[in-house]
A protein has these predicted regions:
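Beta-strand-rich domains and repeat architectures in extracellular enzymes and scaffolds
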Residues: 62-92
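Residue-level detector of Asp-centered blade-edge/turn motifs that repeat once per structural unit
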Residues: 77-78, 125-126, 189-190, 230-231, ...
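Hydrophobic beta-strand positions that form the internal "hydrophobic ladder"
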Residues: 82, 130, 194, 232-235, ...
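A flexible loop/linker signature enriched in serine peptidases of the S9 family
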Residues: 85-95, 110-116, 133-160, 169-182, ...
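Short loop/turn segments that connect beta-strands within beta-propeller blades
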Residues: 98-102, 163-167, 206-210, 251-255, ...
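Blade-loop segments of beta-propeller domains
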Residues: 103-126, 130, 134
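Serine-hydrolase catalytic core recognition
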Residues: 290, 421-732
Length: 732
């Protein structure tokens, strides 16, 4: 082997052959000089080998989680400015960039990993001001805001504004809405006011501040989804009344609400036509009591249009009555648009795939915009409203790319392609630029400008210089059969240089309506998990990330597979199939396979240990569900359901708790005790059952922390504990 100069340009010292060491010994010093040169060379060789090893083998968890995760990318309606939320090591700030050069820079300067999320962002039409929310939604039962730092003054859920030109953020009011993703900021067409829903009413505040937020009107029910009319004179809203709901129009010049074609049904998602003459909305049947819980049944729906002045309306289109005709769960709200040319864009799964359609507001048959065996996810209109920009997995099933299609129909145009991933497209007001968020297998999510030849990263300085991209592996797409023949996709992470059998891990996402991809994920929770899987791979584990049935992007039949969840846990067979796949690899020791996951992935972790400790030697369970019967008993309509007790029994039998007497392998339980999604009591109860059955378990509890943990330092602590636990349980 010929050694070349090390990095930095220094020449390697010459090596004297051992046969020459005896020469010059007569002067009493020659051999010592030669020996010193040899030792220096060996030291140099050792340093070179260490540097080469570090270049691909060694990095810290903090390094691979040091990225500046971007989210909530938005574009101004009348300027070339875009904005997004950046979360770097738990410090969340707003960044902006502007056409044509898109030099990115922060406009807020928060400095602490304080657990204060920024779940919503909007720009005024001219792009001069950003309006955003800080804090998390209220617990519906207690009315509290998550306070993960245990601050003695508590935490708040507030709306703020900051001018892009500079200055300190100003408080506009409290939002205090309940429910995941309830933060819905709507800025008026003139950019002077912002409306939002909170405390069951709609509120309005001046963007300039100086005046307290005011309740828009006193309206019965829970009022959500405020939408400004194009002229700014009215606000449409959805008023939920329990078993029915209305679309109401608040006119700033009137003293009463106009309701659009009120009925016994449930109306939602109001959308104004570009000229303000019509409002489109979705109508579903009102709540029917006494229905059984176990059978699957269709959820038909219709699109209505109405005159916002008179309230008169009519049905524009209605779905069929099969399961595929149900209102799609994936993108029903985000895909519902009133576009240019008097056309309404909507999502439907009538052919078994989540696709976009459009229909003229004057009537007629809908047009399929996105044909094929793939699914659409992010959806937005172009600045002129004549085309739809969307992300999908078309032609690249385990990635996302961007596409464009005219609202009247035509061949979709691919905007991005290749071994990258893109999502959340936006277009500048002049229609010249498309921007998005994106990642690769080894580069974390960042904002990008889409070009004719690819994409250009914005805000490169936000990516830490020591981020270990060169040391990460590119996961391999794998497909394997489950016990019933269903084909399951996964991503296989293999340590570099791995040739002999060693430990392996199965990882399961939560949701379960999620899909993991061949790179850093678009959701913060899974972006973190992808980094942890890279870290575990770096420590010597083969990791298989499993897209089990019930996940998205493989068609409705896959997502809505029968006998899953509390109705039979059929999805668990996919996890066993993943273990069997690993057992068949020559680089995996079949006796040292563990599993880990969070939320639904935590449930499947517990299921694996409870049912198959002979397959899974250890597991880490982040906030998993352990007893489905508790959730079944809290379903709407449970009390009046004729099969209530049968459903509860079925839920119990589909749970890890039901098989705890077979549980033998050790487990690490991790959860925050202020979890709004999976009650902490699920972990408390499981721990008592494990104790009673003498099963070894360890625990890491974060007081006052949420389900999707808000503190970066808690993610790091949890992931370090995961790696250390597997090191003790699976390494020889």
């Amino acid at each position: 082997m010929q050694l070349r100069a090390a990095a930095g340009g220094k020449k390697a010292p010459s090596l004297t052959p051992l046969s020459e060491l005896g020469k010059g010994a007569a002067d009493g010093v020659g051999w010592r000089v030669m020996l010193q040169k040899t030792l220096r060379y060996l030291a140099f060789l050792s340093a070179v080998l260490c540097l080469a090893s570090a270049a691909w083998a060694g990095f810290r968890l903090e390094q691979v989680m040091s990225y500046s995760f971007p989210d909530h990318l938005v574009a101004a309606a009348k300027s070339g400015r875009v904005a997004w939320v950046s979360n770097q090591r738990g410090v969340r700030n707003l960044w902006v960039a502007e056409a044509p050069h898109f030099h990115a820079h922060p406009i807020t300067h928060y400095t602490a990993d304080d657990g204060q999320d920024i779940p919503a962002l909007a720009l005024t039409p001219d792009g001069s001001t950003a309006v955003y929310v800080r804090g998390t939604e209220l617990f519906e039962d207690s009315g509290d805001v998550t306070n993960p730092t245990s601050n003695v003054h508590g935490a708040k859920h507030e709306v703020w504004a900051v001018d892009v030109a500079g200055g300190e953020p100003r408080l506009l009011g409290e939002i205090n809405c309940a429910g995941e993703d309830c933060e819905d900021l709507q800025i008026s067409p003139d950019g002077k006011s912002v409306a939002w829903a909170g405390k069951k009413q709609v509120w309005i505040a001046p963007v300039a501040g100086g005046k307290a937020a005011q309740q828009l009107a006193q309206v019965r029910g829970e009022n959500v989804s405020p939408r400004w009319s194009p002229d700014g004179r009215c606000i449409a809203l959805a008023s939920r009344r329990g078993d029915h709901s209305f679309i109401g129009i608040y006119d700033f010049g009137r003293d009463s609400i106009v309701y659009l074609a009120p009925s016994v049904d449930r109306d939602s998602m109001p959308r104004w036509s570009p000229d303000g003459k019509l409002v489109a909305f979705v109508r579903q049947p009102g709540v029917e009591r006494g229905l059984p819980l176990i059978p699957e049944r269709p959820h038909p729906w219709a699109i209505w249009v109405a005159d916002p002045t008179s309230g008169a309306g009519h049905e524009l289109w209605h779905s069929g009555s099969t399961l595929n005709d149900s209102l799609p769960e994936l993108t029903e709200d985000a895909s519902f648009k009133f576009a240019a040319g008097n056309r309404v864009v909507f999502a439907s799964e009538q052919d078994g795939w989540n696709h976009l359609y459009s229909i003229s507001a004057a009537g007629g048959a809908p047009t399929l915009l996105t044909p094929g065996q793939f699914e659409v996810e992010d959806v937005t209109l172009s600045s002129d409203g004549r085309t739809v920009l969307y992300s999908s997995n078309q032609s690249d099933v385990d990635r996302r790319h961007l596409w464009r299609v005219p609202v009247e129909g035509g061949a979709p145009q691919a905007l991005t392609r290749g071994e990258t991933m893109e999502w959340k497209p936006v277009e500048t007001a002049d229609g010249r630029y498309v921007l998005c968020l994106g990642s690769t297998a080894t580069t974390p999510a960042m904002p990008y400008l889409v070009t004719s030849t690819g994409r250009d990263m914005l805000g490169k300085d936000a990516l830490p210089a020591d981020f270990p991209s060169a040391q990460l592996v590119t996961p391999k797409q794998v497909v394997f059969p489950s016990a019933d023949g269903l084909q399951i996709h996964g991503q296989l992470f293999v340590p570099r240089g791995r040739t002999r059998p060693g430990p392996a891990l199965v990882w399961m996402h939560g949701g379960p309506i999620r899909q993991m991809m061949l790179g850093f994920h678009y959701m913060g929770y899974y972006h973190n998990a992808y980094a942890e899987n890279q870290y575990l791979t770096n420590l010597g584990y083969v990791v298989l990330s499993v897209n089990y049935r019930m996940g998205i992007m493989y068609g409705r039949a896959f997502r809505e597979a029968p006998h899953c969840g509390p109705k039979g846990a059929a999805e668990y067979q996919d996890i066993v199939a993943a273990a069997h796949y690993l057992q068949g690899l020559p680089i995996v020791d079949a006796h040292r396979i563990g599993l880990w996951g969070g939320s639904y992935g935590g449930l499947l972790t517990a299921m694996g240990l409870a049912r198959d400790s002979d397959i899974f030697a250890a597991g880490v369970d982040f906030a998993g569900v352990h007893d489905w019967s508790v959730f079944v008993a809290n379903l709407p309509g449970f009390r009046n359901a004729p099969d209530a007790e049968e459903a509860r029994k079925q839920g119990w039998e589909s749970s890890p708790d039901a098989s705890v007497e077979h549980w033998q392998s050790p487990v690490l339980l991790i959860q925050g005790d202020d979890d709004p999604d999976v009650p902490f009591s699920q972990t408390v109860d499981l721990a008592q059952r494990l104790r009673a059955n003498h099963v070894r378990f360890e625990q890491l509890v974060f007081p006052d922390e949420a389900h999707d943990m808000l503190l970066w330092r808690n993610w790091v602590a949890g992931y370090k504990a995961t790696a250390e636990f597997f090191e003790r349980m699976l390494k020889p």
